[in-house]
Amino acid sequence: MKQKVVNIGDIKVANDLPFVLFGGMNVLESRDLAMRICEHYVTVTQKLGIPYVFKASFDKANRSSIHSYRGPGLEEGMKIFQELKQTFGVKVITDVHEASQAQPVADVVDVIQLPAFLARQTDLVEAMAKTGAVINVKKPQFVSPGQMGNIVDKFHEGGNDKVILCDRGANFGYDNLVVDMLGFGVMKKVSGNCPVIFDVTHALQCRDPFGAASGGRRGQVTELARAGMAVGLAGLFLESHPDPANAKCDGPSALPLAKLEQFLTQIKAIDDLVKSFDELDTEN
């Protein structure tokens, strides 16, 4: 079945093409750290031949605690993204939380992301669609894979068909997430074979019901990423940090930056193998 291709500049994103890495840090902690992390990602992905898009948030508007670090904000965040693009020649993805942010962010970055908690907010969807930018839609933890077709339809009605879908797990009881590997195929089907990517980092979150921040299971990041990529996906969404224990957001789920090359070597091998197979139709 023909898979839809979304172009991010010269990077082609599709379920049957070599996977694209959307990788970086959870939130911009400082200009210098962003430069360090981006440089390492660029070095490793160029060595391994993996198409790469840098990711980070300029504002984490949905932190559990009012006292948690949110980021540098819109103005400073866009300056950092511009410097990363100019210095390393990378594409950039970041999330927006309000309709008023959509165009200013789209003027700087290459992909704008619709957060999971906001994915059904029609005003925000319409504002993002109007920018004409490539869109990454995070599947809400509380929405089934089959419902994602409705969100894609909203973007199409808004005149934007450059849509990527991203799964980050589903609620499993209270304070836990699981990833349904069958859901990836459902999301492809209901969206007209839009590219589907896997956010392995946030799928590893495990909340403390009485805590002010999310916990995580980064010790299982490799096995979960390998399982997801074995389905045959357009990309992987990954967060890393040189010192996860002291990261300002989601450190417990972040891959240690020093392990990036070893990790991606395994992921690329699985992606290459899976996409070397002929498509097998078992419905007919």
From Swiss-Prot:
Keywords: Cytoplasm, Lipopolysaccharide biosynthesis, Transferase. Transmembrane segments: none annotated. One of its GO terms (cellular component) is cytoplasm. InterPro entries: Aldolase_TIM (IPR013785), DAHP1/KDSA (IPR006218), KDO8P_synthase (IPR006269). It catalyses: D-arabinose 5-phosphate + phosphoenolpyruvate + H2O = 3-deoxy-alpha-D-manno-2-octulosonate-8-phosphate + phosphate. It comes from the Bacteria. NCBIfam families: KDO8P_synth, PRK05198.1, PRK12457.1. This is 2-dehydro-3-deoxyphosphooctonate aldolase. The lineage of its organism: Bacteria, Pseudomonadati, Pseudomonadota, Gammaproteobacteria, Enterobacterales.
